[in-house]
């Protein structure tokens, strides 16, 4: 029987997960992506978030060392409150995408799941090469695949908040990160992911480099190594493939197409100087186009929260933004509740189910 593996154990009936965010972070080390602030602005961004500087930090989120520290106690307290709010607003599950290289925190995921009664799925896999130590980049494809298999089938021993020891199993591989061009290590990670997926029939999710050709190249490598398209999510398409024609061409490959930066609206995208960050309105337009072209069963939505300023405690929208603000806008555009449920409940459950 197909199940979904969460940090607190298997869910025998995947459809009971409820509303699911398929790409979030509850804790991670993102300091590698710090960007020096523009001249004269360091005095505003290099301090705690206040009413006086939050505007600067929203514009230059990666230029605040405080903001990109998403693994301190202050962040964890704020995340806990936001997940509680998410539950109160109708949320059922969160897929936590922090993988090896950015400091996954399984103990925290378990404790938050227990405290909030929200299903949380943890991921294995490797993030981009730039955050990996040499000991990891020298791993063989077989060693990487063995690690993924172990963390899915047998789990990792963790001490919980109740001073008990438990084995936490991962419920997917991801996010598997790659740059552009894709490095040799990242190609190994993609191949190891595909080979493991082929054996376990587990769900996987990829983080593409910031180039419109990156998603298709990842899928090519993944399929050639034996991975199944219908168990694969391509993340961040809203910031990667901006042209609707190109997006439809990618959709033909058969993966889930994820629009996971809802709530991120800024006039300058620091991590891609030659591109731009679409608005929520543009994300909705892309989803409308996908629905009109018959891809209702391939669309997923999320926020990819990974900096403090997007949590409600620090003036952000939190994990409830889609529930509170976007679903209403979808309804006003004539997208019926059945379609919304397919995108936010049925599609995630179908992607996450596996027989283990």
UniProtKB/Swiss-Prot annotation:
Give the EC class as a word: hydrolase
| Cofactor(s) the protein requires to work | a divalent metal cation
Q: Which Pfam families match?
A: PTE
Q: Which GO terms describe its biological process?
A: catabolic process
Q: What are the alphabetically sorted keywords of the record? A: Hydrolase, Metal-binding
Cofactor note (record): Binds 2 divalent metal cations per subunit.
User: What are the binding positions for a divalent metal cation 1 in this chain?
Assistant: 23, 25, 175, 304
Indicate whether Hydrolase appears among the record's keywords.
yes
**What would you give as a GO molecular function for this chain, any one?**
zinc ion binding
Ligand binding (a divalent metal cation 2): 175, 207, 236
The name under which this protein is listed is Phosphotriesterase-related protein
The source organism is Aedes aegypti (Yellowfever mosquito)
Q: Cite the source lineage.
A: Eukaryota, Metazoa, Ecdysozoa, Arthropoda, Hexapoda
């Amino acid at each position: 029987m197909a199940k979904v593996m969460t940090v607190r154990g298997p869910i025998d009936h995947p459809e009971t997960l409820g509303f699911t965010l398929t790409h979030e972070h509850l804790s991670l080390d993102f300091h590698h992506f710090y960007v020096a602030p523009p001249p004269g602005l360091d005095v505003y961004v290099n301090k705690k978030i206040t009413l006086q500087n939050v505007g600067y930090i929203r514009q230059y989120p990666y230029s605040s060392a405080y903001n990109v520290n998403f693994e301190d106690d202050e962040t964890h307290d704020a995340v806990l409150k936001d997940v509680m709010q998410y539950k109160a607003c109708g949320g059922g599950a969160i897929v936590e995408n922090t993988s090896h290289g950015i400091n996954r925190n399984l103990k925290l995921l378990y404790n938050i799941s227990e405290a909030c009664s929200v299903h949380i799925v943890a991921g294995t896999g490797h993030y981009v090469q730039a955050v990996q130590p040499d000991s990891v980049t020298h791993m063989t494809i077989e060693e990487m695949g063995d690690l993924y298999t172990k963390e899915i089938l047998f789990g990792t021993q963790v001490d919980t908040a109740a001073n008990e020891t438990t084995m936490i199993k991962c419920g997917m591989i991801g996010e598997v990160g790659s740059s552009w061009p894709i490095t040799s290590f990242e190609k190994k990670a993609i191949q190891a992911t595909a080979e493991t997926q082929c054996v376990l029939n587990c769900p996987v999710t990829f983080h593409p480099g910031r180039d419109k050709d990156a998603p298709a190249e990842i899928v090519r490598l993944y399929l050639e190594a034996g991975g199944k398209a219908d168990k694969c999510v391509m993340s961040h398409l809203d910031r990667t493939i901006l042209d609707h024609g190109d997006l439809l061409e990618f959709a033909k490959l058969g993966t889930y197409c994820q629009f996971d930066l809802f709530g991120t609206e800024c006039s300058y995208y620091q991590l891609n100087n030659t591109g731009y960050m679409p608005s929520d309105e543009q994300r909705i337009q892309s989803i409308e186009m996908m629905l009109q072209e018959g891809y209702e069963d391939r669309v997923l939505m999320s926020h990819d929260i990974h900096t403090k300023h997007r949590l409600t405690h620090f003036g952000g929208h939190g994990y409830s933004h889609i529930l509170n603000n976007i679903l209403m806008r979808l309804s006003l555009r004539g997208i019926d509740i059945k379609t919304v449920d397919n995108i936010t409940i049925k599609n995630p459950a179908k992607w996450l189910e596996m027989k283990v």
